[in-house]
Amino acid sequence: SIIAVIPYFGWARQDRKDKPRVSIGAKLVADLLSVAGIDRLITMDLHADQIQGFFDIPVDHLYASTIFLPYVQSMNLENLVIASPDVGGSKRASSYAKYLDCPLVLCNKTRERANVVATMQIIGDVEGKDVIIVDDMVDTAGTITKAADIMKEAGARSVRAIASHCVMSGPASERVEKSQLEEMLFTDSIPYNNACAKVKQLTVADMFAEAIIRVMNNQSISDQYLI
């Protein structure tokens, strides 16, 4: 059998038609992988959970929260608040907040065009809090840096961010460096050129290795998950 291990499924944002006469890229790549002959896929933090349904083969969907949550707990932040940079990520952020037993804050944003955030409002209280923004990936860093700056203006004591995939394209490194973020934490699902001193990466190698061992031995991988 052939098992494909793809920590960052790069086509995951193309999970639906956003305008006429365009392909659904995630479904196309899923079909190409199946035709190429893979029997199973191991990946992490897909942009949308329903992408698992694009495949006609078993998909093992791992979660970066397995390594992020112990790291957050080790910080021992007194007034921790978990935040989502947009309403779409509220389910993910809510699961973090529930596990860590802390409040949840949401950001409501409107986009002027792709990768450009026009306005943003905070739903919840961040004054005097240590905020950690949770997202699945950071591309141009426009949303996450704007959220951090607005939360600082609203009285947050500190603002950090964690995201599974370090896309960090274009002006992202410069934006993070100039923002109010104290730390930007990623996994190493995508290599980073260390252009920004605020960026730190945690390895997911052990998590994937454990998943591969369990799959090969026909064991359950669900007890790896924390949330």
Q: What do the PLM-derived regions correspond to, one by one?
A:
Residues 1-227:
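PRPP-associated nucleotide enzymes
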